[in-house]
């Protein structure tokens, strides 16, 4: 984009100060209006924001000072939000593509878009006798409660096909439900009370920068910080002790530490005798099957280090473990989480302020989900059975689904689900809050799946790779152009999103799109859709709140959030402070009969990591300057991270004849990716690391080489097994010396 055209955008916001070399303008806060917003991304921190608007234009955002968690400072991604809102690359109008992938887009009206979409839906219903040929794939592009109107829209049309589950954290969710009956973690702000902190498979320096201040404060008060990770991450570099373990060996390490507690008499006998179920059986398993030396051989640490770690953890009180989501994205991820939970429980650190096995929670998500839970039309039919589609938040098919339910396919095997579905086949796909081509797995298979579809509709803000494979794209609002409410799955603050500006161009929020579709399809075929046809944000927000939410946050209505974010009022900052667990026994369950019933071991036993004949373990975490395929396309982020690389250890690079910046091909049986190499000791010798991100000007996609391998757990609570994103393998070859990839 030429400098002149960029400068013509509102306030010249897309032109850097460096480029213009303009003198600074004195800041006068009286010339601004301030609005309340929240970052709705799939991120630990869910920052509470204050948005500064001048002359109808967002000038900058800052953290809400009322939130002791955000503490007035968003991350670099949050600071870049104006670049997202005013990006010239935003989808501005409803568009139709003549041939998918051709790039031949033409602008259409909202009326035409709704009519074409509604006509296709009615065609499917006439052809199949149901709406099962209509599928929804949606996840975490936005986590505002009103964004669940997309699910409600689908339910209001009838019983449809849903992609159930989550690629994010399901194995760990199931594991903690087997152990404690629910997923619930301490307030992250109480980490300041910890005397010993293990960060296990997480990188908060990149993924939860606001949590780092509590970790640092704990260290200032004498706490020791330990990071366990195969990669020397930014967090690991800041730790007092970094332990590099082999990928997927976390369960063995935790069990080895647990065995040492038994050997040294360091088990909290009060907890295991009075608040736990099945501990004698677990101790017997440890004595008969686990030694510290066995664990050391599997995880790659010395036996002495394992013993020292276990003893140091139990020598102080409280001590805590942060269980990262990356750690459970293995074929044995759920088993690994159960083993870590067991170690923390044996040490007596469950239900203790400053302690805990911290994973996540949904305790502040007690909305009514009115936008999501819509009734199907009278006479609608679907899959025989009463169960609705499962998600982290409950049934999405409507509370009156008695005779029929939606058809459920695995979100982590989206392509396979589309290809295999029949009677009826998936004919039409609605994509919202998601970018399957960037975030789902086995991209070559995804292409084949999309070729099978008769219509693809994407609701998005940018022309990403999935949109390129769509027939119709609908422009959606950013968080600064709509009403919403956002809770966190990590901290305990609740924030409102109020429109700071009017919707840009012709963008509309998910809720308004649902009401428009309802009006259109009911005009064409009365009674075809039950979704309310009136769009009134106050009514919708009113219906999401209840007495429980009001009491938890000390508010009378959502309007109170306009004064600033509110924190949940809890008896203690510790999860399970009363040791009243939600398991069948009412106790912490070292032995879970429910896990055994669901095909797992009753005890948290060792399960090995996947193996391969390929020489390198492939890791594809997200980069500091993006969340999955979001943000990295913005101009500011391109300055920090303009090009993707594969990171390889010096000794491995030497064996392959690869030097810094050489052009290489990373490949496996799924596909291949070409890019440049970076040589670093931050990765192990048998590792290749490629950060997942969306680079719009480059042919780069890690999903070319990531298979849709399932994790061991996740089905019970989320409707599908998790994704073993890190149980992947690859090889690499040199294809060019010191060249850049176009």
Task: Indicate residue ranges for each PLM-predicted region.
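Glycine/threonine-rich phosphate-binding loop and adjacent beta-strand/alpha-helix elements that clamp
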Residues: 188, 480-503, 514, 518
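Acidic/polar loop patches that form or flank catalytic/metal-binding clefts of enzymes
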Residues: 162, 268-270, 306, 320-321, ...
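N-terminal export/assembly segments and adjacent metallocofactor-ligating motifs
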Residues: 1-264, 275, 282, 302, ...
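N-terminal leader/propeptide and maturation segments of large enzyme subunits in energy/redox metabolism
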Residues: 95-112, 129-130, 264-303, 384-388, ...
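Extended redox/cofactor-interaction regions of prokaryotic respiratory oxidoreductases
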Residues: 148-216, 221-227, 251-255, 344-468, ...
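Long, contiguous, secondary-structure-rich segments that constitute the structural scaffold
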Residues: 510-561, 629, 634-647, 651-742
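Short acidic (Asp/Glu) and glycine-rich catalytic loops that position anionic groups and cofactors
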Residues: 233-238, 285-291, 315-323, 393-394, ...
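Conserved short loop/turn motifs at secondary-structure junctions
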Residues: 134-143, 297-301, 324-331, 363-364, ...
